[in-house]
Swiss-Prot record:
PANTHER family in alphabetical order: 50S RIBOSOMAL PROTEIN L9 (PTHR21368)
UniProt-listed Pfam families: Ribosomal_L9_C, Ribosomal_L9_N
Organism placement in taxonomy: Bacteria, Pseudomonadati, Thermodesulfobacteriota, Desulfuromonadia, Geobacterales
Keyword terms, alphabetized: Ribonucleoprotein, Ribosomal protein, RNA-binding, rRNA-binding
Gene3D superfamilies with a match to the protein in the record: Ribosomal protein L9, C-terminal domain (3.10.430.100), Ribosomal protein L9, N-terminal domain (3.40.5.10)
InterPro entries listed in its UniProt record: Ribosomal_bL9 (IPR000244), Ribosomal_bL9/RNase_H1_N (IPR009027), Ribosomal_bL9_bac/chp (IPR020594), Ribosomal_bL9_C (IPR020069), Ribosomal_bL9_C_sf (IPR036791), Ribosomal_bL9_N (IPR020070), Ribosomal_bL9_N_sf (IPR036935)
HAMAP family the record matches: Ribosomal_bL9
Protein name: Large ribosomal subunit protein bL9
GO molecular function: rRNA binding; structural constituent of ribosome
Entry function: Binds to the 23S rRNA.
Source species, domain of life: Bacteria
Family: Belongs to the bacterial ribosomal protein bL9 family.
GO cellular component: a single term: ribonucleoprotein complex
Length: 147
């Protein structure tokens, strides 16, 4: 008997796979537990439609992430901080401050998505990586000046 998996099933397959199983396994386990549906032509067409729709949404989100990355790449943030005589900051520039600066520039970004290679504790020009999407990241330029 052929079934379409609705869940990942160990030693059988992943979501959306069409697999051939024993009729008893399908009737007594997979179908009642909701792990699979019978592989009829109607269900197969619905599965293909759902896959196409999911792929379309995925591409749309990826395209929006690429546009946001281009916008972030074009930005250069300037942060004024108090510093001592040797240009060392009192404190450090954090990803939270960078998120607030991005918000002031019209880009809403969670601070956890902004990654600093090392803490910014001196005056100068630095870069930070912004992880927008698992496949898309942008480099943000940050200039730290004396307040």
């Amino acid at each position: 008997m052929k079934v379409i998996l609705k869940e990942n099933v160990d030693n059988l397959g992943h979501i959306g796979d069409i697999v051939k199983v024993a009729p008893g396994y399908a009737r007594n386990f997979l179908l009642p537990k909701g792990f699979a549906i019978e592989a009829t032509e109607k269900n197969a067409k619905a599965l293909e439609h759902a896959k196409r729709h999911l792929e379309y949404k995925k591409n749309k989100v990826l395209e929006a992430a690429k546009q946001l990355a281009a916008k972030i790449e074009g930005l250069s943030l300037s942060i004024a901080h108090q510093a001592g005589a040797d240009d060392r900051l009192f404190g450090a520039v954090t990803n939270m401050e960078l998120a607030e600066q991005l918000k002031a520039n019209g880009i809403e970004m969670d601070r956890k998505r902004i990654v600093l290679a090392e803490p910014i504790k001196q005056l100068g020009d630095f870069t930070a990586t912004v992880k927008i999407h698992p496949e898309v990241s942008a480099t943000l330029k940050v200039a730290v000046t004396k307040a």
